[in-house]
UniProtKB/Swiss-Prot annotation:
Protein keywords: Cytoplasm, Lipid A biosynthesis, Lipid biosynthesis, Lipid metabolism, Lyase
Stated name of the protein: 3-hydroxyacyl-[acyl-carrier-protein] dehydratase FabZ
The protein's role, per its UniProt record: Involved in unsaturated fatty acids biosynthesis. Catalyzes the dehydration of short chain beta-hydroxyacyl-ACPs and long chain saturated and unsaturated beta-hydroxyacyl-ACPs.
CDD domains: FabZ
Taxonomic path: Bacteria, Bacillati, Cyanobacteriota, Cyanophyceae, Gloeobacterales
InterPro entries: FabA_FabZ, FabZ, HotDog_dom_sf
Amino acid sequence: MIDNIEIQKILAHRYPFLLVDRVLVFEPGVRAVGIKNVTINEPFFQGHFPGRPLMPGALLIEAMAQVGGIVCGQLPEAVGKIPLLVGVNKTRFRRQVVPGDQVIITAEDLRTRQKRFGIMQTRSEVDGKLVAEAEIMFSLVD
């Protein structure tokens, strides 16, 4: 398990854009399973949407990319580099994420090429049901 303090040593993100609370499973360079606890106190709920709060899909993708960043950030070729989101393919949103949900995010390294570019297969679930999935592309930059 990786707690929030350790996550902040791996990722450059901070509140309000650090969207991973904890990592339950971690296989360096292979896969990670992280958690995002969604509360009504999230700043994005003020405007998305008043009276019917929903987690924006773009932020769900960002949370999946951050779990992917934890995986690729631990690759040997990533030492001293920052993993940046450079593309998203095959994205599907299946269900809404609302306050009180605990999102379980899985990211698996599909392939890392040229030691600077890679693709992660990601998925998010709430209560065992798929809410979103995407292929996340990243680049390692100095």
